[in-house]
Amino acid sequence: MEINYYQLQIFNARAKRYSTEGEENTLGYMNFDGVPSLGNAPKQLIKDKTSLADFYLSSSDLGSRKIISSRVKELFERIRLENVRYIPCPIHQGKKVFKEFWITDVIHFDDNEVDFNLSKFELCEGWVEEEVNGIPVKFGERFTEIKFQNLGEKIEFEKNKLNHLSKIRTVTLFIKQDCLFPFIYLKEFGIYDIIISYKLKEAIQQQKMDKGIEFKPLEIPEEEWGGPNGLRKQFYS
């Protein structure tokens, strides 16, 4: 099966919060509820003496939001408009300020584009085996493969069948072959990278916007991708 979607993984150093006394009405974590966030992007600081890139991770207080350059924004807006708001987010580097940057505010997620027939999940069950004076001191765990027919079934299972020590782990994730979106965002699978199509990957590379980023095939599990013997070596020497 051909690879049709990739995780756009950003390895440029994470921006840091540039504190400004009296700064008000600033963004925080994204709520993943589709409601547009209120406020302005807090000032973001990157390392001195590094050339600018087109993608950055935002400071940790902003969670999974991404910082992108104006030219990336223009590329993305040419091919899809309704799923992300782009909020001005100047980048500070020493005494310099670069205004041509934006931070993402995702208002539409595409979890229904996941192919549940091909995707694989693991049920990670945890429980308390022993307590001392009411304090858990010994735990048990079990890992089993689990299948879901659709997104609703997965959400319902997680809501009603799991205790606080258990979770569903995504092992391999496939996007439907008939998905037409060039890039998507997901919220229910523990993957918060921008997911992009092969064509968009090619466009980013051709326009030399790929400094400090890598494209991990979405279908390859993390444990098979990284490490000294991982499949990443086939893509990045």
Language-model segment annotations:
Residues N4-Y6, E100-W102, Y192:
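Short beta-strand micro-motifs in enzyme catalytic cores
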Residues Q7, N83-P88, I195, E214-P217:
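A structural signal for short, well-ordered beta-strand segments and their strand-loop junctions
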Residues M1-D61:
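N-terminal ordered "arm"
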Residues Y18-G22, E113-S237:
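Acidic, proline/glycine-rich low-complexity IDRs
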